[in-house]
Amino acid sequence: MMHPVASSNPAFCGPGKPSCLNEDAMRAADQFDIYSSQQSKYSHTVNHKPMVCQRQDPLNETHLQTTSGRSIEIKDELKKKKNLNRSGKRGRPSGTTKSAGYRTSTGRPLGTTKAAGFKTSPGRPLGTTKAAGYKVSPGRPPGSIKALSRLADLGYGCGTAAFPYPMMHGRAVHGVEETSSEVKPPNE
């Protein structure tokens, strides 16, 4: 919205002109024509000149490719050489991680030293855990001959129980009969 502006300029508001407002209205229309022509001048699509892409020397690019290719080949050869040393059952297989639970070739858990008190042999078949019931110190599974010989040393025969404390069978049986007779109504 345009507001009329009072001016002391005689060219703008002269004594021979009827009113400044009419002149302003005409000038405003002329100005809009100017704006529209200037707007079309600036609003046309700008055509950019196609930029020429500058390429580096092809010698440098091939040089970079050969050096990177060589470094990859060298890394692969080093990995193959490392895997040659891992033959047999020692260590963990190549391609596995330490978190997979493989023990080192010494038989102790990973991350421990010999000074930590781990024996070189785990004392139980490989692949079993301590929770499987194998004793680590004697190196034999439970139920072995030594355990049977200990029972023989205790002096129990085949007719007696291995449990040294007497069981109270009579009391438990009578208690069950009493509770069952109270719950069941007599048939008589």
Curated annotation (Swiss-Prot):
There is a cross-link at K75, K184 (Glycyl lysine isopeptide (Lys-Gly) (interchain with G-Cter in SUMO2)). It comes from the Eukaryota. The keyword Phosphoprotein applies. It holds the Pfam family DUF5568. Residues 1-20, 79-142 are annotated as: Disordered. Keywords: Isopeptide bond, Phosphoprotein, Ubl conjugation. Residues 1-10, 94-107 have a biased composition (Polar residues). The keyword Cytoplasm does not apply. Belongs to the UPF0461 family. This is UPF0461 protein C5orf24. It comes from Homo sapiens (Human).
